Design a protein with these regions (language model features):
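Class I S-adenosyl-L-methionine
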Residues: 1-109, 114
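A contiguous loop/helix-start segment that scaffolds small-molecule binding in enzyme catalytic cores
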Residues: 2, 60, 71-75, 131, ...
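A generic local structural motif
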Residues: 13-18, 37-38, 62-63, 120-121, ...
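Short secondary-structure boundary/capping segments
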Residues: 20, 42, 67, 124-125, ...
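Structural recognition of alpha->loop->beta junctions
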Residues: 26-27, 95-102, 126, 208-217
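Short secondary-structure transition/capping segments
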Residues: 43-44, 63-64, 116-120, 136-137, ...
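Class I SAM-dependent methyltransferase SAM-binding "motif I" and its flanking Rossmann-like core
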Residues: 84-155, 199-202
Length: 253
């Protein structure tokens, strides 16, 4: 059995209880060493075999899974954040399907949630934004033509940009090229959300690249953009005393 487990954004205590239990029971752990907090490996039993997938190819990862399965053991494939976002899990699951090896998936707290927590922010403010776009800038890995950053930026929605801090100048240019954001649109860079070395840089789209460089941030950071970072919004209808819900009648109704 292979368990794909989300490690959370960084802080060891942000892994789910299920994820922690699976780590404690695993015969083998293959973890994304470039991003997963190594403190989580302290949950492993002494005899557990541990592999750092940052040093491995897909084929090598699968070979380890097959060997453990053949020996009757269980493997935890530990991914950063939540495995469903930029986790490259589909290709692993397809290979396991072909081999008849069972697997399941335990979600984790994504770093985009960790970034919102670091900012004490709500991505979906009434009348400001009810849409969150999660994307990345094209680099060595291409993106579909219809998903170019400038095209997505044209919506003016809340945007969370992964894996792009090393292309910050191009990110800034693409955001402005979309036409919906201006140089004054609020933005922020969150470095290593929930880690002890977490850093939050608040800026605007127009100062995004310069602020990132001034703070020495070159990797392991998310870029967030949108008016949700500003001060304007309207009160939620959910807790408005005049609003009727399934559980409560509005005043005067």
């Amino acid at each position: 059995m292979v368990h794909f487990v989300g490690a959370g954004p960084g802080a060891p205590d942000l892994i789910t209880r299920r994820g922690a239990a699976l780590l404690q029971e695993a015969d083998c752990i293959i973890y994304a060493g470039s991003l997963v907090n190594p403190a989580l490996l302290g949950l492993a039993k002494p005899e557990c075999a541990v592999y750092n997938s940052a040093e491995m190819t897909l084929e090598q990862v699968l070979d380890v899974m097959r060997r453990v399965e053949a020996a009757g053991g269980t493997t935890v494939r530990l991914h950063t954040g939540d495995p469903c976002l930029y986790g490259a899990i589909r290709e692993q699951m397809d290979a396991l399907d072909a081999d008849g090896i069972p697997y399941d998936d335990t979600p984790g707290v994504s770093s985009f949630c960790g970034a919102a927590a670091a900012l004490n922010a709500e991505y979906t403010l009434p009348t400001i934004s009810q849409t969150v776009i999660i994307t990345r800038m094209e680099g060595r890995t291409p993106v579909p033509e219809k998903e170019k950053l400038a095209s997505l930026a044209a919506h003016g929605a809340t945007m969370v940009i992964f894996l792009s801090i090393g292309l910050i100048d191009k990110v800034q240019q693409a955001l402005l090229a979309g036409g919906a954001y201006t140089t004054e649109t609020p933005a922020a860079v969150v470095y290593k959300a929930s880690w002890p070395e977490q850093k939050v840089v608040r800026c605007t789209v127009g100062t995004l690249a310069g602020s990132t460089r001034a703070n020495g941030i070159t990797k392991t950071a998310l870029i967030v953009v949108g008016e949700f970072l500003g001060t304007r919004y309207e009160r939620s209808k959910l807790y408005d005393p005049t609003f009727t819900t399934e559980f409560r009648k509005g005043a005067g109704q």
